[in-house]
Amino acid sequence: TSVVVTTGGGSSAPFNVTLASVAPTITLALGSTSEGLFYTLKNVQVTPTSLANPGDTLSLYATGLGDTTPAAPVSGVATSTLPLSPLPTVTVGGQSATVLFAGIPSGFASLYQINFVVPKNVQGNVPVVVSIGGQSSNSVTLPLFGISAVVNGASFLNTGTAAPEELISIFANGLGNKDQDFDFPSTTVQGVSVTINGIPAPVTALAASGSQINLVTPSNLPTTGTVQVQLTTPSGTSVDFPLIMNAAVPGIFLVADPSNPTAQIAVAQFANTVWLAMPTSTAVALQIPQNCTASNANPLSICGQPAAPGDTLVLYATGLGEVTPNGDPNGTPLGTGVVAPANASTLYETTATTTVTVGGIAAKVLFAGVAPGTSGEYQVDFQVPTGVTEGDAVPLKVSLPGSSTAAATLAVHSR
């Protein structure tokens, strides 16, 4: 079928379209490219600041759902409610929702309303899809109270797994609007708390404006199986969010490069300095001094340069698993919310063997454990091996038995 638009005495060129009995499309919220237009039974629009809850009955609006009974008028608005039969299906977060009504309401023209019940086991920002006649609609986002994702606090990878004593970030709706940068080891900040298998988790930061809360997983969690994460805020308590536990889920902290947003540069300092190992271009983009060694820079002043074979670096990570004094497998693990001694009077090292590879070549690991004065933040001291193929983005990986990091990068150049 061809469509021609005529206006002001002129006509457009024909535009070919394919007609189908159904072509479901969910209406988007005004100004959004992803959020659907949803309303509660009280005709309140659902938005990121006015959330719906699991179990709520909501309405969405869509086009292209096909014939009603009786049929809709060819032109003008419906003068009575025109129901659809059979009903479309609605999935919310991959779960089937109960559809209570679908049709064109009285006073509407070609715009369908679907009333449905949000499944009780979904939460956070979830996708919604309408299907009818073998066709599925666009996927839109429904903002619900609760947790959207739990990610590694260093790499921000969403693997659905975590380890005891790991820094994690939870992205969730309903955290309020007040940020609090650091209140460790408090387990409640601005009325927001998280439990994992019923154990309160120490909070490191609440970024409510970014829908994010950072915390350290309790050290006495199991290292296998699934645990349940539950969020409590002044608005209520979320449904359980499942999280698979492993002995280690390592993740490397990364440097943000303004000149290369996709870069995966590891946070690694030169030993006994605050200099950072990075490409010269990254140091320039960050507007920090370069050529630290050649310029004899102050070791306590920020500076950036590539590492060289033989250099000793301090890499920062999380999720390396159980730590005890000197890595003694029979020692007492660092407790939940306990900070490793800042004066390094006792070094809490990983009980599992930690390995580092640079460009696929094994590096000599000098220390792997919780950084003194921290909890959940690990440091790995290692020497850059010789024989590495040099470059600005040499693959760097940390591994423990049964797990390893996604490959970060390290700039390596001889000097």
Residue ranges and their predicted role:
Residues 1-415:
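A sequence-level detector for low-complexity, Ser/Thr- and acidic-rich stretches
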